[in-house]
């Protein structure tokens, strides 16, 4: 039954915030000061993960269909066939046109293949050097490998082959992807027919349709609507599911998912806002499936299958990896979160973390607690105010690429306990975000954590056990550094400790030219280890304002070399 569009808009305005928002380059500095900040916010439909199975025909209101409810932010701009914000909608189509007009030959081919292939097959390239093993051991296949030089017939079919086999060696992984991306509840057909927003190529002749698809797109039915993008939804459902099972490729896979969305704009199929909406639906649907009690055994089987010789132990170094560059991935992913839209709504809304969203990080940050993963999502979320993204629960503002880099801010004492015996990210991980906040980082456990950001958090660092690598000059932030056990490794020259340094035990590892700069007092003890490097008489290993104590043990010094303590430095002498 089709519902009245005006009635839908009225319900939306009552049930959800419809403010629109924008994205700065820097990670939002919002901090969860108490656990109350991390509590989920209930939408008109309840919580997405609890009611995702209601995304079916006949459920067409924000109250009885979580996808319709999540996407109801679009009613700020369009409903009942009328534009409510012509400027945003005009920008939406203008951006779509510009993107199609600047389409390169390689982008044309890629977007064509994205269009024709099974939606799930599209994400295999995100596996990079593991794609060869996946194709072999999942019996993955496609019947589209090149783009034709002439337009396809209007009735040309999509892929007819099974994308991968659920009875293959990687069957559990294939089944989990199918459960997420091909369930009766994962589609966008219902919400599209509620919103009824016309495709961009039918709104403006400036949107240049991909020539190979011109006949197909011209013949599409009139109710083949734009918002949200179904391909993008499926891309994030598939990409995030694969990322759960293969967290070693987390950021690469979600970057490919975002690229699939971009491919839809390149082909002229979808507008940027539709792609942004598709990311939201795909993210929420994946979290719902991964949280569903019925899928827990399959979820574990998929992870285990991926971590065998069938996939992660069969790396193909000769295979191409389109997602090997971290900075390129980061720039691409984060730009596609907002597609250049500026904030146009309430920019002062606190971050919201949806119920169950933390499951998306469970395998990527396995050493954190459930609440800590929610805190990561909170401190890496987008600011409010961007078009479409301010849904009631907070799915639109999740920045999972940044979240995979660990905390964005420390608002309290955060203890990270890593067990190296469990392997993977439990054994070693790197936080790349620029940490802010007034909280303290406490490193415990046997694993190794690397801090690689330009950090400004003021609560200091305490190392109790394991290894903490300072991989940027400002990795330790602005507070005191206390070394009570484990290994503190300085890997960058001229690393600065902005507070005091206090070593009671453990091992401080420096290079001959590290020149650790301690801004205030240093209290020395424990072991100093010098790594191999060029030795020069009189080199400053560290400087400080004042010093008490000396190292109890010094290792790594070649024969004939010594350390010399002065009022403000520790020197290498011969």
Q: Which residues does each PLM region occupy?
A:
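Extracellular, surface-exposed repeat/solenoid domains
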Residues: 508-574
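Charged, amphipathic alpha-helical linkers/stalks
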Residues: 284-368
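Hydrophobic alpha-helical bundle signature of multipass membrane enzymes
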Residues: 33-266, 336-406
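Extracellular beta-strand/loop-rich repeat segments of large surface/secreted proteins
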Residues: 441, 472-538
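C-terminal segment of classical bacterial N-terminal signal peptides
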Residues: 20-30
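Bacterial N-terminal signal peptides that target proteins for export
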Residues: 2-16
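Alpha-helical transmembrane segments that form the membrane-embedded catalytic/substrate-binding core
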Residues: 231-235, 266-295
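Extracellular repeat-rich scaffold modules on cell surfaces
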Residues: 408-479
